[in-house]
Amino acid sequence: MPATPLKSALQIHRINNTNTATNMISHCHKQPQTATSNGGATLHRRITACCPVSAPETVGRHHTHTVGSNQCSSAVVQHIAAPVSTVWSVVRRFDNPQAYKHFLKSCHVIVGNGDVGTLREVQVVSGLPAATSTERLEILDDERHILSFSVVGGDHRLANYRSVTTLHPSSNGSGTMVVESYVVDVPSGNTKEDTCMFVDTIVRCNLQSLAQIAENLARSNRSSSLA
């Protein structure tokens, strides 16, 4: 009889050891990482904080995933010195993820017009263990700034991948805190730790790219308003 899937709740903590998985992507800043456990059951629920953060209490509600026995789950937090509205204008474009996800070459919408249920096919850059990914938009909440998608097909090794991204005003009111969490099957021949290290690296690079783009956009908007 299969074990009952466990629910992994958001736990933000400082990470204290390193892993060579981050070396695979030279332009992404390295971040120390670790894994946590709950009641003896390994959840591999980690938070990689790209800077010191104070997460709103509501964050955990959106980033609690049911984690199967052969799955891992993790999250990355990124502070961005730009308003939520500016960051959201980039994140919400389900039809244009390559705008800040530089490991994607292109995106083609297969079904839908950007509403929940829309399907997209993305082409992955060479050098990663993937070629294409077919993804379904699960949540697009413009009021609460939540986007979620799931991987439903393609040529890759990340089966049953589901991601949730939320945006929150920074506690000091000067920017945005982005939290992106995921749950994914552990590929055959890999460990939960290795899988989370790999995906964390990709997500972290994406969010660092998002920060650069949104901050540049915010500066441009400020300059235009003063002109």
Sequence positions of predicted segments:
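Structural signal for hydrophobic/aromatic residues that build the beta-strand cores
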Residues: V87, V91, R120-V122, L137, ...
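Glycine-rich portal/gate segments that line the openings of hydrophobic small-molecule binding cavities
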Residues: P2, H79, S85, R92-A159, ...
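Eukaryote-biased feature marking scaffold/signaling PDZ-domain proteins and nuclear chromatin regulators
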Residues: Q71-S73, A82, R144, R162, ...
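A general secondary-structure signal for short beta-strands and their flanking turns/coil
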Residues: S69-S73, G117, A130, N160, ...
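Short, highly charged C-terminal tails/helix-capping segments
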Residues: Q208-A227
